[in-house]
């Protein structure tokens, strides 16, 4: 009986996942994708119908359509892995490919696959990890958006995409760049205009814009943005999760560039245009925003930390974030409702103007009051809180950072004897701190991140 049952289970089970190989140096279009006969081009595999996937039965896409199988019998199926070996892959576009379960595209062990750009459009269930993406791999180096995940009005939406362990950069070393290069040559990093997209554990450097998320339910986690001349992160979609990212080194000020640079920026768009809608359910947790790791850099800008000026921002959680900046806007929300700003640390990069930075809750630009916002357990050089039912308690406004922190402005761990130790409210305090250490560690909860 057991043998018969096992036979039935094996017959009824799906085929095991297969690993395929792509090698632009040693591969061939005539290969079979095996380790000994790899294919030569990822784009050729995608374009030649070697992936069994799904797409819409016709275009233009209309809501309610049912996906149909395309490339039936192709060697690569949902659940398989494509391993990329060292070499140059050019511009890669994944389109018209809705998988029933994820297909993984990943760097082979020890390999360094290099792409000029990556576009994922009108697709589902792809995981891309371990790749280097830069226009500097091919001459001429031109200003582009290096990684895009996007819907398409004609071909259909994209969703359920994961990007991980990417190294995305305009140029590896930008030390010789001046204002013109930072504004006109620097490419932008990752632009996500699709639902349920994750970008994690990636490095984005020497860019114009870092990460832009306008799709809903996105997850931006544990990324480093280092060297940017516009905005570090833009969060425009609903229910976006931004946690444990580090954004540092904003360059080129208003003398050369009209963009008002932000570590994190959001705004709404409604029927009446910018500032007439809502962005809801966003979580900003454990992020670090540093204007300049070298305050003497002559190219450094004056960065707004978290700048949200065209609300309403509804049901937001802003907790355990660190902002080190040379600007008045440390955290500013113009039009906020039903939200929490808890256990954040905001400090001035230096003691000169502009600054010191504040935590601000303010009226919407149309005069409508912010309402029902909790501001608790924060450490900041200034506070400016206006609105209806704004609850503010257990906060410290400080001018002498050395009395609170180990080595300000960059090491904001609390020093022994700091007034912020064991002084916070337990109510509403996050269970972890910015280092993901459980709270409390002493007799009570600590203030700040």
Language model feature labels by segment:
Residues 84, 105, 126-128, 158-163, ...:
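All-beta strand scaffolds that present successive hydrophobic residues in beta-strands
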Residues 43-46, 65-75, 90-98, 116-120, ...:
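Short, T/G/N/S-enriched strand-turn elements that build extracellular solenoid repeat scaffolds
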Residues 93, 310-413:
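Predominantly extracellular beta-rich ligand-binding scaffolds that present long acidic/polar faces
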Residues 24-83, 446:
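Acidic Gly/Asp/Thr-rich repetitive segments characteristic of extracellular carbohydrate-active
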Residues 12-13:
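N-terminal signal peptide c-region/cleavage motif recognized by signal peptidases
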Residues 251, 260-265, 270-335:
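Beta-propeller domains
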Residues 398-449:
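C-terminal accessory segments
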Residues 70, 88-95, 99-100, 118-121, ...:
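Right-handed parallel beta-helix
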């Amino acid at each position: 009986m057991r043998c018969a049952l096992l036979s039935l289970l094996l017959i009824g089970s799906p085929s095991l996942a297969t690993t395929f190989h792509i090698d632009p140096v040693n591969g061939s279009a005539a290969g079979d994708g095996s380790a000994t006969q790899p294919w030569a081009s990822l784009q050729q595999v995608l374009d030649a119908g070697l992936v069994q996937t799904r797409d819409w039965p016709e275009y233009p896409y209309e809501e309610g359509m049912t996906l149909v199988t395309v490339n039936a019998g192709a060697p690569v199926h949902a659940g398989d892995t494509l391993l990329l070996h060292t070499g140059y892959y050019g511009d890669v576009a994944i389109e018209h490919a809705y998988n029933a379960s994820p297909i993984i595209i990943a760097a082979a062990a020890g390999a360094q696959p290099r792409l000029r750009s990556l576009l994922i459009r009108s697709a589902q269930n792809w995981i891309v990890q371990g790749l280097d993406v830069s226009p500097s791999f091919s001459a001429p180096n031109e200003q582009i958006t290096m990684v895009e995940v996007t819907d398409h009005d004609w071909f259909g939406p994209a969703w359920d995409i994961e990007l991980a362990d990417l190294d995305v950069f305009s140029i590896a070393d930008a030390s010789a760049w001046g204002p013109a290069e930072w504004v006109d040559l620097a490419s932008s990093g990752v632009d996500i205009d699709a639902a349920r997209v994750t970008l994690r554990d990636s490095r984005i450097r020497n860019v114009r814009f870092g990460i832009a998320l306008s799709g809903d339910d996105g997850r931006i986690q544990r990324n480093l943005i280092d060297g940017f001349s516009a905005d570090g992160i833009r969060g425009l979609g609903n229910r976006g999760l931004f946690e444990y990212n580090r954004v540092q080194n904003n360059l080129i000020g208003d003398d050369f560039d009209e963009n008002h640079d932000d570590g994190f920026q959001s705004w709404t768009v409604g029927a009446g245009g910018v500032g007439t809608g809502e962005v809801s359910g966003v979580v900003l947790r454990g992020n670090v925003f540093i204007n300049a790791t070298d305050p003497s850099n002559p190219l450094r800008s004056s960065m707004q930390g978290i700048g949200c000026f065209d609300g309403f921002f509804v049901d937001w959680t802003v907790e355990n974030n660190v902002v080190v900046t040379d600007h008045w806007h440390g955290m500013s929300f113009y039009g906020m409702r039903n939200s929490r700003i808890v256990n954040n640390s905001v400090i001035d990069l230096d003691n000169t103007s502009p600054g010191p930075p504040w935590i601000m809750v303010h009226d919407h630009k149309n005069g409508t009051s912010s309402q029902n916002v909790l501001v608790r357990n924060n450490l900041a050089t200034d506070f400016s809180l206006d609105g209806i039912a704004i609850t503010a308690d257990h906060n410290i406004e400080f001018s002498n950072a050395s009395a609170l922190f180990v080595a300000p402005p960059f090491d904001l761990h609390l020093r022994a004897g700091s007034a912020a130790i064991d002084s916070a409210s337990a109510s509403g305090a996050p269970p972890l701190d910015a280092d993901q250490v459980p709270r409390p560690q002493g007799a009570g909860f600590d203030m700040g991140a």
